[in-house]
């Protein structure tokens, strides 16, 4: 059974010679919390605006619930959008901000009152009806913007970096609230962000974008554990890259030569071709072990600690070995400045924790 609710079919959007979105195709399921993630200028907001109807594609088409919406104006689409700057009218109170636009739907006063009360309860703003924008905190303004978008009962809510203006603690709180809200009301959310942690903590699936293209579309766990290329591995979390070349295939493994470390059998999850130098090995910091003594792990390197950063729940180490100029690893075990004599240490890696990636 195909539950595809939104279908993006070979969509491109050009601004002059700039390909903001370049031949993108994917599907979003009904009731899904779906994120578009990428750096500034990657095309994620343009793609969201194409879904909203604020931009029209150069080529390709968009289907929503089986209906072609490619040429429909924004007010004819079953979507609504929440902006980063909230776009709250300062001269009218919360209740009238949320009511704005409902009159055009031909609703009675009683229907409008019920919808507004319901959505105020949904976003936890009961009692704030008479307040103005200047009397609200950042989080409350965000809730007003959400309420105004949801009161029209869209099939899809589009969110353009809605938490970007909030401080970290409030942003973390709003992430949890947004996720809970989406699950409670059950509609499809399409969420744009440049914040990796935000995307992987909230989403059912994430599309990672770069230069107008989808680099990988997967669950958060799959993106982190099995990135498809060097861009995704580097953009999602933190990693160590080691230069490598592939040799011969050996079942599900491939013989790979890691620069200055030797030749090893690495699991070839991406079916990377033999005899290729266009590859790297990626090792996540938390999969490595730092210790005062040599281990029996597959790879064990003697190194020197160059810098440490205490992060509360963990300590981050920047280490130099004779084979590798800089390695980053983390440990949940507390180490002070006296833990390692002369800053000497051993770094251990298991081969199962090494991902072989294409550079592109």
Language model: regions and residue ranges:
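Non-catalytic connector elements of ABC transporters
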Residues: 239, 249-360
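Helix-to-loop junction immediately C-terminal to a conserved catalytic motif
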Residues: 52
């Amino acid at each position: 059974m195909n539950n595809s609710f939104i279908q993006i079919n070979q969509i491109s959007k050009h601004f002059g010679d700039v390909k903001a979105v370049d031949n993108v195709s994917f599907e979003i399921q009904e009731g899904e919390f779906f994120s578009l993630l990428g750096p500034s200028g990657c095309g994620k907001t343009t793609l969201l605006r194409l879904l909203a109807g604020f931009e029209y594609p150069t080529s390709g088409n968009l289907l929503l619930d089986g209906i072609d919406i490619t040429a429909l104006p924004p007010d004819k689409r079953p979507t609504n959008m929440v902006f980063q700057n909230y776009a709250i009218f300062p001269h009218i109170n919360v209740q009238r901000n949320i009511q704005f636009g409902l009159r055009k739907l031909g609703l009675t006063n009683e229907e409008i009152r019920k919808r507004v009360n319901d959505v105020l309860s949904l976003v936890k703003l009961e009692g704030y009806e008479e307040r103005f924008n200047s009397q609200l905190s950042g989080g409350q303004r965000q809730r007003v913007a959400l309420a105004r978008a949801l009161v029209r009962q869209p099939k899809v809510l589009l969110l353009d970096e809605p938490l970007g203006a909030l401080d970290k603690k409030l942003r973390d709180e709003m992430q949890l609230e947004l996720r809970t809200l989406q699950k409670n009301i059950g509609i499809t959310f399409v969420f744009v962000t440049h914040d990796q942690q935000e995307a992987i903590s909230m989403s059912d699936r994430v599309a990672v974008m770069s230069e107008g293209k989808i680099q990988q579309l997967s669950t958060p766990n799959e993106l982190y554990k099995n990135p498809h290329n060097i861009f995704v591995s580097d953009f999602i979390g933190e990693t160590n890259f080691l230069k490598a070349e592939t040799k011969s295939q050996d079942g599900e493994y491939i013989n790979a030569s890691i620069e200055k470390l030797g030749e090893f059998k690495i699991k070839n999850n991406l079916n990377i071709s033999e005899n290729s130098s266009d590859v790297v090995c990626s090792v996540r910091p938390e999969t490595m072990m730092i210790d005062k003594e040599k281990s029996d792990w597959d790879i064990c390197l003697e190194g020197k600690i160059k810098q440490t950063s205490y992060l509360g729940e963990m300590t981050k180490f920047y280490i130099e070995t004779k084979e590798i100029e800089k390695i980053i690893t983390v440990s949940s075990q507390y180490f002070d400045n006296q833990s390692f004599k002369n800053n000497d240490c051993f770094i251990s890696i298991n081969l199962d924790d090494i991902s072989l990636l294409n550079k592109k």
